[in-house]
Amino acid sequence: MHFVFTGTESTFKSTIAKKIAMHFNLLYIPEFARTYLEEISPNTQINPIARKDYNLIEEGQLALLSSQGYFDSNQPKVFDTDGTVLHIWKTDKFDDIDYKLLNIPSHIIYFLCYPNVEGAYDPLRMDLERRDVLHEQYVNVLKELPNTTIHLNQETLEERLRFATTEIERLLNDSI
């Protein structure tokens, strides 16, 4: 099984994913969009993002998922995003519904991070004021998938991390 942390911007996803990976000594696979925007193409305009840049991010994220064993259930791993984020982003920004992005393996366990925490400014964030609306899209997409979704709606990073750790311990113990 693999653990995917998903949800809107500024909900502690990346921080929790990294800490969980360290705690359980699991491979952490980062979000490609941030790598693209910070390292590969740092001068990219993000609001609005050009379709060509989105396409490069989608291509990079899908290649990263594939190369890091997302579709292979061996060895648990922690992913900081997957095709669900791309599906929601593509639908929201370009009105392009791409169900291929929702071809999710059955061994994926989702941790949906809620936007009930204060959003922190980051120059790469573009939808802080729309987190509640976008969160509903995540809820709806994840409801349609057969995968398990664990909701992280605690009000602090520490509480979310504690809850996620407990849930992952339970899942890992149940799989033995």
Q: What role is predicted for each listed range?
A:
Residues 5:
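Hydrophobic anchor at the beta1->P-loop junction of P-loop NTPases
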Residues 58-105:
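Glycine-rich phosphate-binding loop used to anchor ATP phosphates in small-molecule kinases
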Residues 18, 22-64:
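Conserved substrate/cofactor phosphate-moiety recognition/catalytic segment
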Residues 94-159, 172:
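A glycine- and Lys/Arg-enriched "phosphate-lid" helix/loop adjacent to the NTP-binding pocket
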Residues 12:
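Conserved glycine(s) of the Walker
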Residues 151, 165-176:
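C-terminal accessory "lid"/substrate-recognition subdomains
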Residues 9:
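The conserved Walker
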Residues 15:
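Conserved Walker
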